[in-house]
Amino acid sequence: MRLQKSGHVVNISSSLATQPIAGVAAGLLNLTKGGLESVTGALAMEFAGEGIRFNTIAPGVVNTPMNPVEAHEFLRQLSPMNRLAEVGEIADLLLYLESAPFVNGEVIHLDGGAHAGKW
């Protein structure tokens, strides 16, 4: 990336890194993903002059096999939009970031607004 004077790193975090939920054991997640979100900004500043960008996508609950259908009713309540994110929405956001050369150092939450506060 440095040789070609361009590049883009997109990290994947979690909305839990900055919006913990009571009863959800996420200490290790907070430690690792919180650090990842912090280093995104630091690296964005360090390498911006070389044309290399760093961004992070922080999804909330995503509709994957990791979340069984039986749990969906409860999990939907964790989003003010009352639904789970879809994998394709993460891909869409990634494609947007690839097409937006002036977006750098951002943590973008894909959680229906859950990170914004309580509802």
Name each model-derived stretch.
Residues 17-21, 116:
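Conserved catalytic-site region of short-chain dehydrogenase/reductase
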Residues 18, 54, 58-68:
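Short, flexible catalytic-loop segment of classical short-chain dehydrogenase/reductase
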Residues 70-89:
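Catalytic Tyr-x(3-8)-Lys segment
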Residues 1-8, 19:
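A short helix-coil junction within the Rossmann-fold of NAD(P)-dependent oxidoreductases
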Residues 14:
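Residue(s) in the substrate-gating loop at a strand-loop-helix junction
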Residues 86-110, 115:
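C-terminal substrate-recognition "lid" of short-chain dehydrogenase/reductases
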Residues 45-49:
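Alpha-helical segment proximal to the catalytic Tyr-Lys
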Residues 32, 40:
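Active-site helix of classical SDR
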